[in-house]
């Protein structure tokens, strides 16, 4: 239980702290002061032992999505560094300086991809991919990309007359 992030006062703004059941947003858990078991050491372990592919296997409801969202919250350009104040990873000053808020992060979850048939599931998947490409559309202006890569990226965000992503 020593990893449980506790505040001095169990009551915040007159309300008791709650368990974050079903919440997979790291930012929401921290900002709304839900109980949180500090798993930020995972960030340190992952960045020190980086593999070409990292596989995270756990049964359903074991925090995979929350951990991936925590990692995104740490690495993504423009992240709110204060979210990690007081958490274990914040003690790793060099690691935070090198990695925190330094990367564009493509984050895809297939939780909401659904359909009653192949075409509707495909359309739902295309929408999920297109929305993530649109969220990171500033990447299409990166000086690190060739013109061809920029054009390919921009094509991912084109929508048709029905509001569907055309080129995903």
Give short role names for the model-derived ranges.
Residues 53, 106-117, 152-159:
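Short acidic, glycine/Ser/Thr-rich loop/turn "cap" segments at secondary-structure junctions
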Residues 4-78, 82-92:
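Walker A/P-loop-proximal flanking segment of P-loop NTPase domains
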Residues 34-35, 117, 121, 125, ...:
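Phosphate/oxyanion-binding active-site loops and adjacent basic polyanion-contact surfaces
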Residues 26, 71, 125, 129, ...:
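Generic structural signal of hydrophobic/aromatic residues within well-ordered alpha-helices
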Residues 135-168:
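Mid-core helix/loop region of P-loop NTP-binding domains shared across ATPases and GTPases
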Residues 13-19, 98-105, 141-152:
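Short, compositionally biased low-complexity segments
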Residues 48, 73-143:
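P-loop NTPase motor core
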């Amino acid at each position: 239980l020593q990893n449980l992030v506790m505040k001095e006062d169990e009551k915040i703004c007159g309300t008791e702290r709650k368990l974050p059941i079903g919440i997979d947003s790291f930012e929401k858990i921290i900002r709304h002061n839900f109980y949180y078991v500090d798993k930020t050491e995972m960030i340190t372990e992952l960045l020190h032992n980086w593999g070409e592919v990292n596989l995270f296997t756990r049964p359903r409801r074991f925090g995979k999505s929350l951990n991936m969202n925590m990692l995104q919250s740490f690495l993504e350009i423009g992240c709110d560094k204060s979210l990690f104040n007081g958490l274990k990873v914040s003690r790793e000053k060099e690691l935070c300086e090198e990695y925190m808020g330094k990367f564009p992060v493509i984050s895809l979850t297939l939780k909401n991809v659904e359909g009653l048939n192949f075409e509707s599931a495909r359309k739902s998947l295309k929408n999920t991919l297109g929305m993530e490409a649109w969220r990171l559309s500033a990447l299409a202006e990166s000086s690190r990309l060739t013109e061809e890569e920029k054009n390919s990226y921009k094509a991912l965000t084109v929508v048709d007359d029905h509001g569907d992503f055309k080129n995903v």
